[in-house]
C-alpha cells in the first residue's frame, strides 16, 4: 500500500554506515503525469510516498540520503540530509515530485541530484541547500520539464568547506551536453543563490553543446539575489531565456556571461560590485536576438575594475537591443 515515513517532529535520526542510499523508494510508474498513463497499482498503492521530519546522517564515503526510482507524487517535507554523498538522488524515471522545508546540508556530492532521469513536474521550495561539494541542485544526462526552484537559500556549494580539490560546479547546475539530454520549462525565482568563488564555478550554470537540436530554453530567472562566484550567471547554447528583476553582484569574471545563445531577454536587473576584491560586468559572445533593457551596472570604486574589463561587452553578436541601461 501507500508509504509514509514520519520522524515525529524531527526527533528521529538514521545513520547510514554503508554505501548507497539510506532510503531507496522504488515504484513501477512508467507513464507520464497524465492520470490516464498510470497503471491501477500505481494509482492505488504507489501514489504519494511521503518522507517527513527525519534526519539522515552519513557515516560512509558512499552513503546517500534518498534515491527515487519510478515514483509518482513523492513528497519530502522537513527532511535533513547531512554528511552523505548525495542528498536526494532521482534516477531513471519519476513524476510530480515535491521537496519543501528541507535542509540538504554539508554533503560531499550533490544536494538534489537529477541524474540520468526522465522527470516532468518537480518543485523545490522553501529549503536550505548548502555546503554540498558538487553543487546544490544539479541536472545531468536527463530529460526534465516543469522544474520550479522557488524561495530557497542555495549557497556555498563548492569544495571550500570540504577542504578538497576544486571542481567546476554551481549552486544550480544544468548540463544538457550529453546525448539525448534536454531541459526546458524552468523557473528559478525568489532565491538567495551565493556565496564563495571557486575555479570554473558559477551561481547558475546552464550549458549545452552548440549543435544541439533542443537547446535549454523556456527559462525564467526572476527576483533572485545572486552573488560571489567566478561567474554569477553563465549560459552557453541557450534559446529563449528571461532574466529579470535580479540583484547580481560580485564576480571574479562576469556577473552575467552568455555564450552562443539566442532570444535572451534581460530586464530590470541590478549588477554591482559588492566587495573590493570582486568585479562586475556583463559579456555576450556569439549571441543574437538579445534585448538588454532597464539594467544598471555599477563598479562603485574609484580604482575601477581589478583587470580594467569593460562593464558591458559584446563580441561577435548580432541583433542586440540595449535600452535604458545605466
Task: Identify the residue ranges that each predicted region occupies.
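Short "repeat-start/strand-capping" segments in structured domains, especially the N-termini
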Residues: 1-3, 47, 70-75, 93-98, ...
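Beta-solenoid repeat scaffold
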Residues: 1-16, 42-53
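Well-ordered beta-strand segments characteristic of repetitive beta-sheet solenoids
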Residues: 3-7, 24-29, 76-80, 102-103, ...
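Beta-strand-rich extracellular passenger or scaffold domains
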Residues: 12-16, 33-39, 297-300, 322
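Extracellular beta-strand/beta-solenoid scaffold signature
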Residues: 17-42, 59-68, 82-90, 94, ...
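Extended, compositionally simple hydrophobic/Ser/Thr-rich segments
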Residues: 76-77, 86-89, 96-102, 111-113, ...
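Leucine-rich solenoid repeat scaffolds
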Residues: 289, 293-299, 305-326
Amino acid at each position: 500500500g501507500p508509504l509514509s515515513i514520519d520522524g515525529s517532529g524531527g526527533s528521529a535520526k538514521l545513520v547510514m554506515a554503508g554505501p548507497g542510499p539510506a532510503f531507496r523508494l522504488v515504484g513501477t510508474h512508467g507513464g507520464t503525469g497524465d492520470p490516464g498513463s498510470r497503471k491501477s497499482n500505481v494509482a492505488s498503492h504507489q501514489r504519494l510516498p511521503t518522507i517527513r521530519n527525519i534526519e539522515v546522517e552519513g557515516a560512509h564515503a558512499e552513503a546517500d540520503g534518498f534515491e527515487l526510482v519510478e515514483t509518482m507524487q513523492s513528497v519530502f517535507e522537513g527532511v535533513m540530509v547531512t554528511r552523505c554523498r548525495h542528498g536526494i538522488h532521482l534516477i531513471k524515471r519519476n513524476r510530480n515530485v515535491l521537496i519543501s522545508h528541507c535542509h540538504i546540508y554539508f554533503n560531499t556530492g550533490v544536494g538534489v541530484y537529477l541524474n540520468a532521469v526522465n522527470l516532468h513536474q518537480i518543485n523545490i521550495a522553501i529549503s536550505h541547500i548548502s555546503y554540498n561539494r558538487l553543487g546544490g541542485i544539479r541536472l545531468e544526462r536527463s530529460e526534465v520539464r516543469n522544474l520550479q526552484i522557488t524561495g530557497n537559500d542555495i549557497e556555498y556549494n563548492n569544495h571550500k568547506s570540504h577542504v578538497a580539490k576544486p571542481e567546476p560546479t554551481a549552486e544550480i547546475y544544468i548540463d544538457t551536453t550529453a546525448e539525448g539530454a534536454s531541459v526546458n520549462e524552468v523557473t528559478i525565482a525568489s532565491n538567495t543563490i551565493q556565496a564563495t568563488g571557486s575555479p570554473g564555478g558559477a551561481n547558475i550554470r546552464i550549458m549545452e553543446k552548440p549543435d544541439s537540436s533542443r537547446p535549454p530554453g523556456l527559462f525564467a530567472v526572476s527576483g533572485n539575489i545572486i552573488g560571489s562566484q567566478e561567474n554569477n550567471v553563465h549560459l552557453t547554447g541557450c534559446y529563449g531565456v528571461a532574466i529579470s528583476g535580479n540583484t547580481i553582484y560580485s564576480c571574479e569574471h562576469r556577473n552575467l556571461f552568455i555564450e552562443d545563445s539566442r532570444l535572451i531577454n534581460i530586464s530590470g536587473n541590478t549588477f554591482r560590485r559588492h566587495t573590493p576584491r570582486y568585479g562586475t560586468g556583463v559579456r555576450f559572445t556569439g549571441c543574437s536576438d538579445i534585448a538588454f533593457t532597464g539594467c544598471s551596472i555599477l563598479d562603485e570604486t574609484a580604482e575601477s575594475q581589478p583587470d580594467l574589463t569593460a562593464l558591458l561587452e559584446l563580441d561577435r553578436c548580432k541583433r542586440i537591443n540595449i535600452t535604458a541601461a545605466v
